[in-house]
């Protein structure tokens, strides 16, 4: 095995050292690493994946058998897929895809910035609320002081005017009622008294005049005879 390794890697003395020193992970992990590193849209072929693993790791004589077995297990577990059939390219499914450590760090950095920006936003409304609290009692006190003198000034004259008006109106009404009642009583008395006096006198005057006029006529007739 020693001469074959040296003959197949002439001019690559450094890589031979890495192959012997690097530990060999599971074949399934080797396939996933190869597909992620190659980063092909439709997946990577078996030959490309095997070449990537052989160039990076020192594999044994049973590499092909272990490789095929790992692919079969990955397909059954739903981690790998072959869209073009058993002889086609190998592709990773979303479940098996793992983000690189560099991409995870980049995704974590914007999250920290968002948290820092949110802190001053929360503090601003608290400051505004504190500044607004002392202003409310001052306005309420000013409004109360302005209302009290106005209410006192208006209350006194209104009470006096109302009392005088009521008294004047009551006196005027009472005076009118007394005048009307006295005038009405006088008219009624006059009407009742007049017809009694005139009704008895008129017929007596007429009878006396007739009697007086008849007497001289009889005397004149006697003289003429």
From Swiss-Prot:
Cystine connections: none
Positions with biased composition (Low complexity): 128-147
Main localization (coarse): nucleus
Sorted UniProt keywords: Chromosome, DNA-binding, Nucleus
UniProt record, GO biological process: chromosome condensation; negative regulation of DNA recombination; nucleosome assembly
SUPFAM superfamilies: Winged helix' DNA-binding domain
A GO CC annotation given for this chain: nucleus
Domain H15: 23-94
Domain of life where this protein originates: Eukaryota
GO molecular function, one term: structural constituent of chromatin
InterPro entries cross-referenced by the UniProt entry: H1/H5 (IPR005819), Histone_H1/H5_H15 (IPR005818), WH-like_DNA-bd_sf (IPR036388), WH_DNA-bd_sf (IPR036390)
Cellular localisation: Nucleus; Chromosome
Stretches for region Disordered: 1-20, 95-147
Comp. bias (Basic residues): 107-127
Protein's job: Could act as an H1-type linker histone.
Family (UniProt): Belongs to the histone H1/H5 family.
Protein name per UniProt: Histone H1
